[in-house]
Swiss-Prot record:
It comes from Antirrhinum majus (Garden snapdragon). It comes from the Eukaryota. The gene is TAP1. Residues 1-23 form the signal peptide. Keywords: Signal. This is Protein TAP1. Stamen. InterPro entries: THNL (IPR038975).
Length: 107
C-alpha cells in the first residue's frame, strides 16, 4: 500500500515537471504557494482532485507535526474537493481553510 502511494506521488511529480509546474513554488509562503500550485496544476491538465492532494503536501513547510498542517490538509480535502469545476470557489475555500477554519492559537 505504501509503495503505491510513493508511486502515485512520484508520478504526480513527474507530470508536474513535464508540464512545467515548477518546484520554485515551494519557496513561497504556504498560502501563496498553494494558490499558485493549484492554478499551474490545473493549467497542466492534471485532474483537480490530484492537484488538491499534491499542492498542500508540496507547499506546506516541512514541520508536518503541527496541528495547523493537518487541519489545512484535512479541510482542503474535506471541504474544497467538491469545487473541482469552479476555480473561484476552490480558491475561496482554500483561503477559508487557511485563514478561518484552521487558525490555531498557540497561546
Amino acid at each position: 500500500m505504501e509503495s503505491k502511494r510513493v508511486d502515485v506521488l512520484v508520478g504526480l511529480m513527474l507530470i508536474m515537471a513535464i508540464f512545467g509546474v515548477h518546484s520554485v513554488t515551494a519557496h513561497l509562503p504556504p498560502g501563496i504557494c498553494i494558490d499558485h500550485c493549484m492554478k499551474e496544476c490545473k493549467l497542466s491538465g492534471i485532474g483537480v482532485v490530484a492537484c488538491i492532494k499534491y499542492c498542500p503536501v508540496h507547499c506546506l513547510p516541512p514541520d508536518s507535526s503541527s496541528k495547523e498542517h493537518f487541519c489545512n490538509l484535512g479541510c482542503m480535502l474535506d471541504k474544497c474537493a467538491k469545487f473541482n469545476d469552479d476555480e473561484k470557489k476552490m480558491s475561496d475555500c482554500v483561503f477559508d481553510c487557511r485563514k478561518f477554519h484552521c487558525k490555531i492559537n498557540t497561546d
